[in-house]
Amino acid sequence: MNKKKRFEILSLFYKKNSNPKIELVFSSDFELLLSVILSAKSTDVMVNKITGTLFQIANTPQSILKLGFNKLRHYIKSIGLYNTKSLNIINSAYLIKTKYNNKVPSNRTELESLPGVGRKTANIILNVLFNKNTIAVDTHVFRVANRTGFAKGKNVIEVEKKMIKIVPSIFKKYVHFWFVLHGRYVCTARQLKCKTCFIEKLCEFDKKK
């Protein structure tokens, strides 16, 4: 895909949604961190359902630590990998309380030192909370980038590096959310909605439906 076509695609996304938002519901930095940790291998809908209850009980490092591992497991048991996620959340809460003065770290190295926080999670946190032009590549972004021909790559790191290089700075903060929403509701894994897709004419996918 050439530079001109990419710019047209991004311009159409901007025209349709000039201020895309993450679909996770949160009211503090720590709540977002927990929500993103919980979202691994799960849906935002499921995470929001769980945190709607959990955050009324515990939504700070102190209250999570007071809640403890077993009770935390009880609140998130309907989500995948809940044992691992419970342990990661407890350990991350401890580090944030003891090492980072109860504040979510604002740089990648410190973020990725937290249990349960990998590159994708760090990219989301840096983008949403700290206004950084990071591009998190999840399954939706990976699919849309490859399928449309926008930024092809064999793995998420390859796609991320390519997108960082080719996406103009004015669009960098938004492109993750545009592609996530597009992959979630239009360019889905199986039920493609090409006939109603607003970038269909620019898309280079050769098996449109």
From Swiss-Prot:
Ranges of residues in domain HhH: 108-127
Binding locations of [4Fe-4S] cluster: 187, 194, 197, 203
PROSITE patterns: ENDONUCLEASE_III_2
Taxonomic superkingdom: Bacteria
Assigned keywords, A-Z: 4Fe-4S, DNA damage, DNA repair, DNA-binding, Glycosidase, Hydrolase, Iron, Iron-sulfur, Lyase, Metal-binding
Catalytic activity, reaction form: 2'-deoxyribonucleotide-(2'-deoxyribose 5'-phosphate)-2'-deoxyribonucleotide-DNA = a 3'-end 2'-deoxyribonucleotide-(2,3-dehydro-2,3-deoxyribose 5'-phosphate)-DNA + a 5'-end 5'-phospho-2'-deoxyribonucleoside-DNA + H(+)
Keyword Iron belongs to the record: yes
Record EC number: 4.2.99.18
Cofactor or coenzyme needed: [4Fe-4S] cluster
GO function term, MF aspect, one: DNA N-glycosylase activity
UniProt cross-references to SMART domains, sorted A to Z: ENDO3c (SM00478)
One BP annotation, GO: base-excision repair, AP site formation
Disulfide partners: none
EC class: lyase
Cofactor note: Binds 1 [4Fe-4S] cluster.
SUPFAM superfamilies: DNA-glycosylase
Gene3D superfamilies for the chain: Helix-hairpin-Helix base-excision DNA repair enzymes (C-terminal) (1.10.1670.10), Hypothetical protein, domain 2 (1.10.340.30)
Keyword 4Fe-4S found: yes
Stored HAMAP family: Nth (MF_00942)
Family stated for the protein in its record: Belongs to the Nth/MutY family.
Protein task: DNA repair enzyme that has both DNA N-glycosylase activity and AP-lyase activity. The DNA N-glycosylase activity releases various damaged pyrimidines from DNA by cleaving the N-glycosidic bond, leaving an AP (apurinic/apyrimidinic) site. The AP-lyase activity cleaves the phosphodiester bond 3' to the AP site by a beta-elimination, leaving a 3'-terminal unsaturated sugar and a product with a terminal 5'-phosphate.
Entry protein name: Endonuclease III
Record organism: Buchnera aphidicola subsp. Schizaphis graminum (strain Sg)
